[in-house]
Amino acid sequence: KNAEELGAGEIVLTSVDREGTGSGFDSELIKRVTEVVSIPVVVHGGAGRLEHLAQIFNNITEISGVSIASILHYDYIKKYKDLDGYESEGNIDFLRSSKSMSHIHSTNLTNIKEYLISKNINCRVVHDN
């Protein structure tokens, strides 16, 4: 509420304890925030499969969007395994090992959009030229 009162136009709400876990969004935290603010809230942290996206949009209609990362990373890495030259970016040993996170079901933006549209969830659609 303070952020809104100080002039924030949008809140990106991250459940840090759920980041990278694939356990789903923190619905209780999200509800507590969306009930007290009138500005858009984008939620982040916990998405591990497509169903998590549908659940959060269907259960908490006050959110304006989601931010996702892990469910996109592993699909990307499978396609683009050449990590040479990125050693300075951090620990890439896990990515090179080809291990997967058991709670995270990899996907891509096309699949996400098709899934959301199939569930009648508003989604900005970008058409290829």
Q: Language-model segments: which ranges?
A:
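Alpha/beta catalytic cores of nucleotide-metabolism and tRNA/nucleoside-modifying enzymes
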Residues: K1-V43, G48-N129
